[in-house]
Regions:
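Short, glycine-/aromatic-enriched active-site segment of Class I SAM-dependent methyltransferases
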Residues: 187-214, 219-225, 246-252
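A transmembrane-helix-recognition feature enriched in membrane-embedded lipid enzymes
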Residues: 259-285
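Short N-terminal helix/helix-N-cap motif within the alpha/beta-hydrolase-1
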Residues: 166-170, 197
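A short glycine-rich, Lys/Arg-flanked "PGG" loop and its adjoining helix->strand segment in the class I
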Residues: 169-184
């Protein structure tokens, strides 16, 4: 599977409004719509010399380095929390498709309640999901046209995926095609309209010019979903538990970006005394939206 490069996007994906330069590093730019606030990288997803996106071309070794992170109980807890959220709106035994399944933690947890399968463009991640998570994950992308999927699923999930997609409208349209009548879509993504994002500005930790090519606010993502035939039924934020060692290291990595983050990192150094301890964190800057597919023509 080879994801084609898309044309450089000069206008907003959501409202077609003009964009203004917000951040530039090397040949990568981050542009924000002056009308609705949608923020994107015009150059789209990074491609490797072989013409593959970075999500298709990563090796299995990349995932092997993060074995402990992916199998950590907090990662599984986060996946199970999402599965429980889905279960509030979708009956047990329903057919579920997880888009961008990564190493299969959510598919594994969802399989306890649903007939769940995942698609993931990275062969290394798929191999890891099968070997370590024993999850039903296939190599594939939401942009692949799979006729057998049309109208098949009672639920489609896109957890921490849409920010990596440079054609989010097309991705949501395909999700809608794969849903059965009255099916449910579940999306989580960083909220660039959140208080935390506004406080940190360009130093916000979800500003990533390599990977996060589409950044939404709650308002403009709701607008995009409505335009693709979805009715919002639930909104919430998501956090998770993190090891002290992970928090301290992440703050160290980010501390060069702003004076505020340098101060926060300095205050976090005592976390090294108990690296294996966990703390729950929810800054309110990761949104979750549950949306029901409206009947055609409504």
């Amino acid at each position: 599977m080879n994801t084609p490069r898309t044309a450089v996007r000069t206008n907003c994906e959501i409202c077609a409004g003009p964009g203004e330069l917000w951040l530039e590093k090397g040949r990568r730019r981050l542009v924000r719509c002056t009308a609705c606030g949608f923020t994107w990288i015009p150059e789209g997803v990074v491609h490797t010399p072989r013409g593959l996106s970075i999500y298709e071309d990563e090796s299995l070794n990349f995932y092997a380095q993060y074995t402990d992170y992916y199998r950590d109980e907090s990662a599984v807890d986060a996946a199970r929390a999402k599965a429980d959220w889905v279960s509030r709106f979708v009956p047990s035994g329903a057919r579920l498709l997880d888009v961008g399944a990564n190493v299969g933690a959510f598919v594994k947890c969802a399989s306890e309640q649903f007939d769940a399968v995942g698609i993931e463009p990275n062969p290394g991640a798929v191999a890891w999901a099968r070997e370590h998570m024993h999850a039903s994950v296939e190599i594939g992308s939401i942009f692949d046209e799979v006729e057998a999927y049309v109208g098949r699923f009672d639920a489609v999930t896109m957890f921490d995926v849409i920010e990596h997609v440079d054609e989010p409208t097309a991705a949501l349209r395909q999700c809608r095609r794969y849903l059965a009548a009255d099916g449910m879509l579940f999306v989580t993504t960083p909220d660039i309209g959140s208080v935390c994002s506004r406080l940190l500005g360009r130093a916000w930790y979800y500003v990533d010019l390599e990977q996060h090519v589409s950044l939404f606010s709650l308002a403009n993502l709701t607008r995009l979903l409505a335009s693709q035939g979805f009715e919002i039924v639930d909104r919430r934020t998501f956090g998770r538990r993190y090891r002290f060692s992970y928090i301290e290291q992440r703050l160290k990595d980010l501390s060069h970006q702003s004076a505020l983050l340098r101060v926060v990192h300095a205050l976090s150094v005592p976390l090294r005394l108990a690296p294996a301890w966990y703390v729950p964190i929810n800054f309110g800057d990761v949104i979750g939206i549950a949306a029901r597919a409206r009947p055609a023509g409504v």
